[in-house]
Amino acid sequence: MKNKIFLASILLTPILVVVASSLYFSYGISSDDTWRDNTKNHGVFFKSYFEFNQFNKNEKETLIEFEDGKWVMAVYITKPTKAVESLKWMRRLNVALNRDINRVKRVAFYSNALIEEDVNTLLKEYPRTDLINDKNGILINVLQRNSFIDMNEENPIFIIDPYGRAVMYFEPSTDKVEYKKILKDLKVLI
């Protein structure tokens, strides 16, 4: 009898641990802030991954070219006044990457022909940022559908991997501490 209780406790302990940890994780018993501070992931993943190759009109005309091993830091400009902060932080993050500066490409997308002049004027302040016209505006709709914030209002920085998949975006913040956390994320990704 004593051996059966001992055997049952040995066999049931791992099952009990797995069930308890699963419940703990799924019901979110711990504070979300505590979890976010102890992780390297400070961005928000898109609801589903989507590839930028789907936006190509044909094989000769592509929306964006992906170079080997280069990640893309991008912003979709719908309002130039809102995008200034994201462009500024994109440049600062790129410079802060130090030796990995050449592994990241900065891109700005826009689709509204009415703001084209304002966007060109704005990008003169941010050299080495490629400007891409999303002529039919499909990209902003896909970004909006796959994010938890209003991409038209916020104009956040988002990350595209070297294979053309949109991975995550960073919610806009004026807090320098948040951008230090974003820099840590980028260093892990790159």
Q: Language-model features: where?
A:
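Structural microenvironment flanking redox-active thiols in thiol-disulfide oxidoreductases
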Residues: 81, 85-125
